[in-house]
Swiss-Prot record:
GO terms for molecular function: aspartate-tRNA ligase activity; aspartate-tRNA(Asn) ligase activity; ATP binding; nucleic acid binding. It catalyses: tRNA(Asx) + L-aspartate + ATP = L-aspartyl-tRNA(Asx) + AMP + diphosphate. Belongs to the class-II aminoacyl-tRNA synthetase family. Type 1 subfamily. CDD domains: AspRS_core, EcAspRS_like_N. This is Aspartate--tRNA(Asp/Asn) ligase. Keywords: Aminoacyl-tRNA synthetase, ATP-binding, Cytoplasm, Ligase, Nucleotide-binding, Protein biosynthesis. The record marks H30 as: Important for tRNA non-discrimination. Aspartyl-tRNA synthetase with relaxed tRNA specificity since it is able to aspartylate not only its cognate tRNA(Asp) but also tRNA(Asn). Reaction proceeds in two steps: L-aspartate is first activated by ATP to form Asp-AMP and then transferred to the acceptor end of tRNA(Asp/Asn). Homodimer. Its EC number is 6.1.1.23. SUPFAM superfamilies: Class II aaRS and biotin synthetases (SSF55681), GAD domain-like (SSF55261), Nucleic acid-binding proteins (SSF50249).
Length: 594
């Protein structure tokens, strides 16, 4: 129906007759000449109709925004006075000789431009219209380029694209499963995969030593700006490669994406132990563009006559830390109060601070309500340790280690954003040497990543002291966002059983849930490992979108619903009967009396 896209017509097409198909972006009538800006996925071109062709001119006079047209005409150069430097096609126009209205359109519920501020609920309800906007078109085109580049890179590195099942069984991976009732097996359910984890490990046992898949995954969890109930994962697994080799291959992939699609050289991906990331930056995914660090001062505060500091300093599970903000002395008190409220989200009971007006005057040069509680020798040691200068601001955290780490880690990111402290545009790194387990409130252990991650110790050492064991896991972080995570997997049956035992999974439960995996590990499972990248999150970062909902064609809302199709929806009684499901009426809970 067409010979060329609207957005690619240029001066090389001058004097050629072309046929275009697209949507009316704008229509203007200027002194008897009708101008139509015709839009398709590649951009916009101006089409001109004049009264000399009366029938086509009359038809052009009827078109309105978002009508679908087929236009034939001759490309001609614009006059110097009418060249539009803001359009890619602004040096030419198409003189229309034929016009066909393929479909009319009602007035859209919102303007399809980049300047109209439309609520996200409206955009999602009319997503098929929202996707016509240039920003959305560009993001989805970019996404297609990324997936194509990923496939090419992995194909060139001898990886095989192998699909794994969508209907599988529930396995403990940290979030709730989406369950699918079985019609043919009464009372039993499939689960939609949270990841292809076990199947890709089984592919390694099968001898497919380099696997990848751009896989749909599903998690029934609370949603945030970077979460969706269904999401896309770049899933990778290899045999006979250690951590450094896996990190090298995947680092090369991400570097190539940025180089070829963004024109950005990411440079070196430094390695940082998990313990250092948490101690200095308060996060296992630190944003290394921000030049702020948390400094331990527990030893300085253990004996001061200020319980807010000395209490946590004397507590083995407490932490007292300080963070210097260069030039932060100019932050007004009102903003400090706002930061105090901000850290309370993470359990902090307050936010102590010192403004350094004159570091040589410990009595009059330090501005803070807490200075009077701290001896001068402690203040001097504090200033020396932090290497402060006049005009700096020091924030303090004193509480349980968990609260201090999370609160000041979040404050560090907030300060970086508010004060524009970023020292570079992109800061990648690998976080390594993660703990194997983390302790829950009841004292039990849970896997920090998942129970198939290999520890960096023997089964005997793991059994003797599981709480201190490190894993062979690694996360790729970019600008404070976890792009992907992975690990070397357990390929020895006895080690896998020991990890299950540490996690409180008895032999009977092991056989019930993971019998197929334990059996596979008996038949010559090779050393293997891999990782997975969140494709949606990667595209969000690369395009600068504020949410992954802006890089997915048809996303769900933050309540895991589709307002366009009204999903999830009710099903008829017959379908429920076939699935052996009976719905109980929802009983309203009585309100508590105040």
């Amino acid at each position: 129906m067409r010979s060329v896209y609207c957005g690619v017509v240029n001066t090389s097409n001058i004097d050629q007759e072309i046929t275009l198909c697209g949507w009316v972006d704008r229509r203007r009538d200027h002194g008897g000449v009708i101008f139509i800006d015709l839009r398709d996925r590649e951009g916009i071109v101006q089409v001109v109709f004049d009264p000399d062709a009366a029938d086509k001119f009359a038809l052009a006079d009827k078109v309105r925004p978002e009508y679908v047209l087929r236009v034939t005409g001759k490309v001609r150069a614009r006059s110097e006075a009418t060249v539009n430097a803001n359009m890619a096609t602004g040096q030419i126009e198409v003189y229309g000789t034929d016009l066909e209205i393929l479909n009319s359109a009602e007035t859209p519920p919102f303007q399809l431009d980049e300047h109209t501020n439309v609520g996200e609920d409206v955009r999602l309800k009319y997503r098929y219209l929202d996707l016509r906007r240039d920003a959305m078109q560009q993001r989805l085109k970019f996404r297609s380029k990324v997936t194509n580049a990923i496939r090419n890179y992995l194909d060139d590195n001898d990886f095989l694209d192998i699909e794994t099942p969508i209907l599988t069984r529930a396995t403990p991976e940290g979030a709730r499963d989406y369950l699918v009732p079985s019609r043919t097996h009464d009372g039993k359910f499939f689960a939609l995969p949270q990841s292809p984890q076990l199947f890709k490990q089984l592919l390694m046992v099968s001898g497919f030593d380099r696997y990848y898949q751009i896989a749909k995954c599903f998690r029934d969890e609370d949603l945030r700006a970077d979460r969706q109930p269904e999401f896309t994962q770049i899933d990778i697994e290899t045999s006979f490669m250690d951590e450094e080799q896996i990190m090298s291959v995947t680092e090369g992939m991400i570097s190539k994406l940025f180089r070829e699609l963004k024109g950005v050289e990411l440079g070196e991906f430094p390695r940082m132990p998990y313990a250092e990331a948490m101690e200095k930056y308060g996060s296992d995914k630190p944003d290394m563009r921000i030049p702020l660090e948390m400094v331990e001062i527990k030893d300085l505060m253990a004996s001061v006559d200020f319980k807010v500091f000395s209490g946590p300093a004397s507590d083995p599970k407490g932490r007292v830390t300080a963070m210097k903000v260069p030039g932060g002395g100019e932050i007004p008190r009102k903003k400090i109060d706002a930061y105090t409220k901000f850290v309370s989200i993470y359990g902090a009971k307050g936010l102590a601070y010192i403004k350094v007006n004159d570091k040589t005057d410990l009595e009059g040069g330090l501005q803070s309500p807490i200075v009077k509680f701290l001896p001068q020798d402690v203040l001097q040691a504090l200033l020396d340790r932090l290497e402060v200068e006049n005009g700096d601001l020091i924030f303090f955290g004193a509480d349980s280690a968990k609260v201090v780490t999370e609160a000041l880690g979040a404050l560090r990111c907030e300060l970086g954003k508010d004060l524009n402290l970023y020292t570079c545009e992109w800061a990648p790194l690998w976080v390594v040497d993660f703990p194997m387990f983390e302790e829950l409130e009841d004292g039990s252990l849970t896997a920090l990543h998942h129970p198939f991650t290999a520890p960096s110790c023997s089964p005997e050492e793991l059994s003797a002291n599981p709480a201190t064991a490190l894993s062979r896991a690694y996360d790729m972080v970019l600008n404070g966002t976890e792009l992907g995570g992975g690990s070397i997997r357990i390929h020895d049956q006895s080690m896998q059983q020991e990890v299950f035992r540490v996690l409180g999974i008895g032999e009977e439960e092991q056989r019930e849930k993971f019998g197929f995996l334990l059996d596979a590990l008996k038949y010559g499972a090779p050393p293997h490992g891999g990782l997975a990248f969140g494709l949606d999150r990667l595209i969000m970062l690369m395009t600068g979108a504020s949410s992954i909902r802006d890089v997915i064609a048809f996303p769900k809302t933050q309540s895991a619903a589709c307002v366009m199709t009204d999903a999830p929806g009710a099903v008829d009684k017959k379908q429920l009967e076939e699935l052996h499901i009976r719905l109980r009426p929802v009983v309203a809970q009585p309100k508590e009396q105040g």
